[in-house]
Amino acid sequence: MKTILRASRIGRVILRYRLDALLEGTPAERWLRLAKPFVPRASAEIAAQSRGARLRLALQELGPIFVKFGQILSTRRDLIPPDVAEELTLLQDRVKPFDGEAARLIVERALGLPVSVAFAAFDTTPLASASIAQVHAATLPPDANGLRREVVVKVLRPDIERQIDADIALLHSLATLVERTHPRADKIRPREVVAEIEGTLSAELDLQREGANASVLRRFWEGSDDLYVPEVIWSHTAERALTLERVYGIPSDDVAKLDAAGIDRKALAAKGVRVFYTQVFRDNFFHADAHAGNIWVDSDPERCLNPRFIALDFGIMGQLSQEDQYYLAENFMAIFHKDYRRMAELHVEAGWMPSNVRIDELEAAARSVCEPYFTRPLSEISLAEVLIKLFRVAQRYELTLQPQLILLQKTLLNIEGVGRQLDPKLDIWAVARPVLERILRERYSPRRVLGELRKRLPEIMTHAPDMPRLVHSWLKQQVEGRHQLDIRSSELRALDLSLRKLQTRVVTAITGSGLLVVAAVLYGLHPNGWYLGTVPVWSWISGGAGSAALLIAWLRR
């Protein structure tokens, strides 16, 4: 019954804000048409607004869970029009706070201690309140030196899980209906969108997980002059309560306060871009909810000429597979060099395009996306927009992007927005390119590769005795398969030639891999003899020969 009432309320809001066109061609549209005479329409002022603005207002009226839904939907620029996405980014996740005494009870249940024991002071008036949780100021009991440390305690809203489950169940039902009846369901992919929202909300409901995210990010940036991450107080953290060191700063979009504090906004904007690319390509652990409200600037007067960011809210973090990291980095470098052919090849190699797509067709599509950007002033070029448009090209071939890539493009868009707000003339390309080149040099340097091989040495040594037998068995199968092939046409002869080339490439690649293994073994054993730096000469020779063999195998594609 509650679900029916909730669905009817959603229907009334859709009609009042004149959003029924979104359901055109579905059974829901027919039901709404019947109900339309009985629902008061929005004022002329609201009716005059754009569809994106009307959708934003409707989501705000439906409540905090739908606000969160709109915020997540705003990141899916591959699915919704740009004008709607821009409006949804204006959604504010601020709601009426719940009772401070209820927050105290939740903290006591989570920690298994009375608040009066766990904290020297706990302010029941929240500092901030959002749809999932609210934040309270507190003070820890004195430590061994008699110091009382200031902290903040993030507390989940009471019964939030039940509210989310009910609304998500309703969204699943609506998504199923839209998927069955909407003429553009294959493009919208409603069930996929709802599943993404469900996953995001589920992650934000576990504050212990958020604490772990903050702890990992802090470890990567400890001692940095670019980014500060508050310390997690693990003794006062549980699934429904997260305690962090209290930090003071200025929101990154409050330009007036930044100027009053004497902050070098130009230096700060460049740092923001560098921090993002370092998180993605060095650490492979990036803050994926990096809007201005979650990025503060350290207000310490001594840092005004060398400012640093403060990260907040670690509920959503992103990671890429090694393959996506590599292909994305290479894609950025191809964009920097205007190498459209390479961009097309990378999209196919990465699996973002079907393997049977014509490379020249894809090259032309990449050129049509990128060239208009290169005619703009450098301060107006957006890598995020280029990436989004390239992924939209991929959508023509009905491929589904990985959620982490969607997270990344949304985060890049946010970071560019913050950077341009701080410094409207920010040349993102000039800042990003040297950072990316340096990280790639370090990531794929011989020393780094040998170090990775050395880490895997025990695993390699364990499986090494089986390698000759496995290689021999595989080659034998290939030879037998070739002899059994009955060639009857020129196409089959071409296929046979292709298979022979493939076998040669595989053998060359296996040889190269074997030589790299030998290089790693020699490096790990520290043999007597000549050294070049800290690496044995024979390791350099074996590693160089192995790398050359792998390069030859790659060039013979």
Swiss-Prot record:
Top-rank lineage group of the source organism: Bacteria
Transmembrane regions: 506-526, 535-555
Keyword Transmembrane helix listed: yes
EC number per UniProt: 2.7.-.-
Keyword ATP-binding (UniProt): yes
UniProt-listed InterPro entries: ABC1_dom, Kinase-like_dom_sf, UbiB, UbiB_bact, UbiB_kinase
Top-rank EC class of the record's enzyme: transferase
Gene Ontology MF, one: ATP binding
Assigned keywords, A-Z: ATP-binding, Cell inner membrane, Cell membrane, Kinase, Membrane, Nucleotide-binding, Transferase, Transmembrane, Transmembrane helix, Ubiquinone biosynthesis
HAMAP family named among the record's database cross-references: UbiB
Family the UniProt entry places it in: Belongs to the ABC1 family. UbiB subfamily.
NCBIfam families with a match to the protein in the record: PRK04750.1, UbiB
Protein name: Probable protein kinase UbiB
